[in-house]
């Protein structure tokens, strides 16, 4: 994976699906104490001619094998073990993510008071969404209708 070229340390608060894959590609993986991870089996929806579907299914099989190899090598599992764990979604929180070697350590991070209390806005249609500059606060702190 491209991300593996760089010596990146990553901190996860939520890493679901492809976020889980990206976290496993990081050199050093951290999770917040109540951070959450989830990985699931590869899934897709498709409709087309049978030949195209068959070819695409082979491609998805290749992709699944590649992603299982990358993730299982970092976690220390056999690909078949990881495939079984992710069959019906594999959810982990904080210390359990560390116990299962999905992260290297637990790290609690905080935003400064200045970052937490400053904000930015996004206008979407008739609404203005106000967000904190702290990336740990993902939901809008205010939403109002533009008049």
Residue ranges and their predicted role:
Residues 1-147:
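N-terminal organellar transit peptides
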């Amino acid at each position: 994976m491209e991300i593996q070229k760089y010596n990146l340390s990553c901190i996860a608060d939520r890493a679901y699906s492809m976020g889980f894959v990206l976290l496993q590609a990081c050199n050093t993986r951290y999770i917040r104490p109540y951070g959450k991870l989830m990985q699931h089996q590869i899934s897709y929806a498709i409709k087309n001619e049978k030949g195209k579907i068959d070819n695409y299914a082979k491609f998805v099989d290749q992709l699944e094998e590649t992603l299982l190899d990358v993730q299982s090598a970092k976690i220390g599992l056999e690909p078949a073990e990881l495939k079984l764990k992710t069959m019906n979604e594999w959810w982990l929180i904080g210390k359990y993510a560390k116990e299962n070697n999905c992260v290297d350590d637990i790290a609690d991070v905080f935003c400064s008071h200045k970052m937490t209390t400053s904000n930015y806005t996004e206008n979407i249609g008739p609404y203005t969404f106000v967000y904190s500059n702290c990336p740990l606060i993902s939901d809008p702190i205010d939403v109002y209708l533009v008049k």
